[in-house]
Swiss-Prot record:
Pfam families per record: ACP_syn_III, ACP_syn_III_C
Protein name in UniProt: Beta-ketoacyl-[acyl-carrier-protein] synthase III
Keyword Protease: no
Species name: Symbiobacterium thermophilum (strain DSM 24528 / JCM 14929 / IAM 14863 / T)
Record-stated family: Belongs to the thiolase-like superfamily. FabH family.
Top-rank lineage group of the source organism: Bacteria
Length: 330
């Protein structure tokens, strides 16, 4: 069986209109613009309207990616939606996107891998296309985390924002596309970043809501230590797996969670700052949407050129991580 090279042929993103600044948060919780900026690098984030859901933004990002790739809904035969904030527990948000797009030929499912979810979805889609099972996949990362954070908890509410990013994956020319990937997990650290209630362990009830157990709970210091370690380790692993070195990287697209984590990884890797995409100052941590949004903006700004080696790397709840090495182009 011939293994086909697979790459990204279209990108798209969608963010809410409402901007919530650090100064706005000063009026909501006991925090300050200076405290948030110096510890996270975040200045503002986007917040969805009360009536909006993840599928609304997933659909907008998907249509933009499809337009860039030049594909029709009838050509899409696989839709993967990476999210921890689905419209509802079931059915899959991907199925709602499939219906709204009119992509009636497409299989559709959701994937829950927190912040690296989009990378996990890209790897799943790549394998399916490489082996000939599918020809054209849509991989979406979407989160409306504003609906899952406790707006009275200053440790978490300042961190997150809402967004969606999407990519179309198709067969590409030899030597282009995804060269390698690395996925991993340290499940013993699951207790450091999680939402306690709302699942089968603690079904939603008046008691769980009263106790705030449906909100994101985070052990910040432990997550920080994990992130600093795996971000550069995964980057080195994925480029070496492709037979390359860190020095070959033209553009690094890291998960946009905390500028100190990014700076630490970049310093340890020895990369020049101009080779690193950072946009968390404007969007905050958008979880699975983080990397496709950053990659979309980098492409729009002309920072991604044909033949460039692009590396995407992320970490998140699980604790899990993932990285991709791509040779850009079709």
């Amino acid at each position: 069986m011939k293994i086909r090279p697979v790459g990204i042929t279209g990108l798209g993103m969608a963010v809410p209109e409402r901007v919530l600044t650090n100064h706005d948060l000063e009026r909501m919780v006991d925090t300050s613009d200076e405290w948030i900026r110096t510890r996270t690098g975040i200045r503002e984030r986007r917040i969805a309207a009360p009536h909006e859901a993840s599928s609304d933004y997933a659909l907008r990002a998907a249509r933009e990616a499809m337009a860039q790739a030049g594909v029709t809904p009838e050509q899409i035969d696989l839709i993967i939606c990476a999210t921890v904030t689905p419209d509802m527990p079931m059915p899959a948000t991907a199925a709602l996107v499939q219906a709204a797009l009119g992509a009636h030929r497409a299989a559709a499912f959701d994937l829950s891998a927190a912040c690296p979810g989009w990378i996990y979805g890209v790897v799943m889609a790549q394998q399916s296309i490489a082996t000939g099972l599918y020809d054209c996949a849509l991989v979406i990362g979407v989160e409306l985390l504003s609906k899952m954070v406790n707006w009275q908890d200053r440790k978490t509410c300042v961190l997150f924002g809402d967004a969606a990013g999407a990519a179309v994956l198709q067969p590409v020319s030899e030597g282009r596309g995804i060269l390698s990937s690395v996925l991993g997990a340290e499940g013993a650290g699951h207790c450091h970043l999680y939402t306690p209630a709302g699942g089968s362990r603690l079904p939603a009830s008046p008691e769980t809501v009263a106790q705030g157990l449906h909100y994101v709970h985070m052990n910040g210091p432990e997550v920080f230590k994990f992130a600093v370690r795996v971000m550069d380790e995964a980057t080195v692993q994925v480029v070496e797996k492709a037979g390359l070195t860190v020095g070959d990287i033209d553009l690094l697209v890291p998960h946009q969670a905390n500028v100190r984590i990014i700076d630490s990884a970049v310093k340890r890797l020895g990369l020049a700052p101009e080779k690193v995409v950072v946009n968390l100052d404007r969007y905050g941590n958008t979880s699975s949407a983080s990397i496709p949004v950053a990659l979309t903006e980098a492409l729009t700004e002309g920072r991604v050129r044909d033949g460039d080696l692009v590396v995407c790397v992320s970490f998140g709840a699980g604790l899990v991580w993932g990285a991709l090495a791509l040779r850009w182009g079709r």
